């Protein structure tokens, strides 16, 4: 089902830099979007298109490298075990394998992270030259810098949308934000699917279907590029290429609706912590990525602006409007985010340990 893009508003975020009336209009639009879908597009965001294209080009080159080369920078080689490269099948979303490969990076530089056997998180300058991925590290960090600035601006607009001081979230949570950025590659499995269907046909009684329904193969679990989930932190700002594949849960039913790429925009969504802080007034909505059978590889770049790891996310105080919108005690994943009372770092490590069980330490729920 294709979405009517009027339902996911396209907000001109540049207006937030104008007068108070324009700021209030942006805040009003964000309020409506966060209550209804938890998703919205932004345009005129100020991130140079050339930077986006440069990043997209260099990550395409990186993912085209042989697997054994990409594994030089695999996850688990630093004390931030979730940073680095992972191959198809290693990321798990709520018990189901995701059909993608990717890398996760943060704002931390190599010198800020303890490495194992002196293996750097990023390719060295010599390796960038050797594997023809020049500018890989520098382009990533320039993008992180620009997206951090943009995301802080969006968080200010979200503050105003809740009738809070513009710097409310900055003072309490994003003064030292936890930044995570993904470079995601969804290979096209179009030809593989065709081959599997042909093999199935040939294996059924010499190419003939069995007349007995009981002998037919049981239906397989539906595959996804990324399974249904909600994001964990405050805000996600996503760049997706023109292949598309993102789907968002409808506000009117249990169905999912397409959230297609729109040139010149990012798509934003709020996470569990903002849902928790607003008592369910703002929605951390389910979304997923379709299994890629398009015949073209898909690339996306999610950027996560999350609370400081040492901060303790709390319900916004003295905000009576929120109580009437409280979430149900249990969500779709049988979790109650409103009962969680630890630091964001504890919440994150618990979540990431389920997504990458092969890599993440389980040391009393603490970041190490």
Curated annotation (Swiss-Prot):
Entry's EC annotation: 1.14.17.4
Comp. bias regions, Basic and acidic residues: 211-223
Catalysis performed (reactions): 1-aminocyclopropane-1-carboxylate + L-ascorbate + O2 = ethene + L-dehydroascorbate + hydrogen cyanide + CO2 + 2 H2O
Keyword Repeat: no
Pathway(s) the chain acts in: Alkene biosynthesis; ethylene biosynthesis via S-adenosyl-L-methionine; ethylene from S-adenosyl-L-methionine: step 2/2
Phenotype of null mutants: Show reduced level of ethylene production, suppressed zyg1 expression thus resulting in inhibition of zygote formation and impaired macrocyst formation.
Fe2OG dioxygenase domain ranges (all copies): 177-307
GO terms, molecular function: 1-aminocyclopropane-1-carboxylate oxidase activity; dioxygenase activity; metal ion binding
Enzyme category, top tier: oxidoreductase
Biased composition regions of type Acidic residues, renumbered to the chain: 194-203
Binding site for 2-oxoglutarate: 298
Cofactor(s) needed for function: Fe(2+)
Family annotation (InterPro entries): DIOX_N, IPNS-like_FE2OG_OXY, IPNS-like_sf, Iron_ascorbate_oxido_reductase, Oxoglu/Fe-dep_dioxygenase_dom
Positions contributing to Fe cation binding: 229, 231, 287
Keywords annotated in UniProt: Dioxygenase, Ethylene biosynthesis, Iron, Metal-binding, Oxidoreductase
TM spans (from-to): none
BP terms from Gene Ontology: ethylene biosynthetic process
Record text on cofactor binding: Binds 1 Fe(2+) ion per subunit.
Domain of life, source organism: Eukaryota
Region (Disordered): 191-226
Biological role: Involved in ethylene biosynthesis and macrocyst formation. Overexpression induces overproduction of ethylene and augmented zyg1 expression and zygote formation.
Family to which the UniProt record says this protein belongs: Belongs to the iron/ascorbate-dependent oxidoreductase family.
Annotated protein name in UniProt: 1-aminocyclopropane-1-carboxylate oxidase
Gene source species: Dictyostelium mucoroides (Slime mold)
């Amino acid at each position: 089902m294709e979405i009517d893009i009027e339902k996911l508003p396209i907000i001109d975020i540049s207006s937030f830099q104008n007068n108070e009336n324009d700021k209030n209009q942006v805040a009003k639009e964000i309020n409506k979007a966060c209550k209804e879908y938890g998703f919205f597009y932004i345009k005129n965001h100020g991130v140079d298109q050339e930077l986006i294209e440069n990043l997209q080009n260099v990550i395409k080159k990186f993912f085209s490298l042989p697997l054994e080369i990409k594994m030089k920078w695999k996850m688990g080689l630093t004390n931030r075990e979730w940073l680095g490269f992972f191959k198809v099948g290693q990321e798990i979303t709520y018990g189901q394998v995701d059909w993608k490969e990717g890398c996760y990076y943060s704002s931390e530089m190599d010198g800020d992270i303890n490495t194992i056997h002196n293996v750097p998180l990023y390719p060295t300058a010599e390796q960038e030259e050797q594997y023809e991925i020049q500018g890989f590290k520098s382009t990533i960090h320039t993008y992180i810098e620009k997206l951090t600035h943009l995301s802080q601006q969006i968080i200010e607009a979200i503050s105003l949308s809740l009738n809070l001081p513009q710097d409310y979230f900055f003072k309490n949570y994003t003064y030292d934000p936890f930044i995570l950025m993904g470079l995601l590659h969804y290979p096209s499995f179009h030809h593989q699917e065709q081959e599997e269907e042909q093999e199935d046909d040939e294996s059924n009684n010499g190419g003939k279907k069995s007349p007995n329904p009981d002998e037919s193969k049981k239906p397989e679990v539906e595959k996804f590029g990324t399974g249904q989930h909600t994001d964990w932190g405050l805000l996600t700002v996503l760049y997706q290429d023109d292949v598309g594949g993102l789907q968002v849960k409808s506000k009117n039913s249990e169905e999912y609706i397409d959230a297609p790429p729109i040139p010149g925009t990012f798509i934003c969504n709020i996470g569990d912590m903002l849902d928790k802080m607003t008592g369910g007034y703002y929605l951390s909505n389910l979304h997923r990525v379709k299994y890629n059978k398009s015949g073209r590889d898909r690339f996306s770049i999610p950027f996560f602006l999350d609370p400081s790891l040492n901060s303790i996310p709390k319900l916004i105080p003295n905000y009576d409007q929120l109580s009437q919108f409280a979430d149900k005690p249990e969500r779709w994943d049988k979790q109650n985010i409103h009962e969680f009372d630890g630091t964001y770092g504890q919440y994150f490590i618990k979540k990431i340990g389920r997504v990458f069980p092969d890599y993440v330490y389980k040391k009393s729920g603490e970041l190490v």
